[in-house]
Amino acid sequence: MSYIVIEGTTVRFLTTTPFTAFNGTVVNPDVVTFSYEVQGQNPVTYTWTNPTGDPTNTIVNNATGYFYADIDTGGGAGVWSWRWASEASTGIDTTGTTVACEGSITVSPSGVV
């Protein structure tokens, strides 16, 4: 999905479908990452690790298999590309998911001075 928001808006990026194991069971993977990149800038990545979570509290696990991150768009006018992904890190994690969802938003500078 692609949206246009005004710079300075806090945007909630969320997984719209859950992370699932190969057998279809909804699971929390061992490691979940949320990454975004504003055109022309370095990518920013946050990591959530099961069971300790995200030390920055940016990624929130709000239900089994579902996650969200609230990101302030201040100072970031341009096209943002974002991605939710996971990597199996133990034999217990059978998700095998590499990308759960991805998309882009356009952050428009505010016209108010």
Per-region residue spans from a language model:
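Polar, enzyme-active/binding microenvironments
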Residues: 1-113
